[in-house]
Swiss-Prot record:
Keywords: Cytoplasm, Ribonucleoprotein, Ribosomal protein. This is Small ribosomal subunit protein uS10. It comes from the Eukaryota. It comes from Xenopus laevis. Component of the small ribosomal subunit. The ribosome is a large ribonucleoprotein complex responsible for the synthesis of proteins in the cell.
């Protein structure tokens, strides 16, 4: 049987490291890339393991509609489209540090989704 010495307290408390996925979506590519670069710069300053940004395929939403409201006249059509860009960033770190990193100012129009899983 092994006995612990009651005089010594544990020196290191191990912090749980999580696998964190940050998903960024936006219609504006420039603001999306700026937020992405800020997040990665903040993570690298804290010496975290970073993977990304992974550029996901752009979704293009299209709507085709008639120009004239009454239905008379020549059949002319308007075509509208909206492009949605998406980026993924993977981090390996404690969740407290991620709260500090994601507290940066995020551009308007950029949506951030954070998913936390155990490593």
């Amino acid at each position: 049987m092994a006995f612990k010495d009651p005089g010594k307290a544990p020196v290191d408390q191990e912090v749980a490291i999580h696998r964190i996925r940050i998903t960024l979506t936006s219609r504006n590519v420039k603001s999306l890339e700026k937020v992405c670069a800020d997040l990665i710069r903040g993570a690298k300053e804290k010496n975290l393991k970073v993977k990304g940004p992974v550029r996901m395929p752009t979704k293009t939403l299209r709507i085709t509609t008639r120009k004239t409201p009454c239905g008379e006249g020549s059949k002319t059509w308007d075509r509208f489209q909206m492009r949605i860009h998406k980026r993924l960033i993977d981090l390996h770190s404690p969740s407290e540090i991620v709260k500090q990193i994601t507290s940066i100012s995020i551009e308007p129009g950029v949506e951030v989704e954070v998913t936390i899983a155990d490593a």
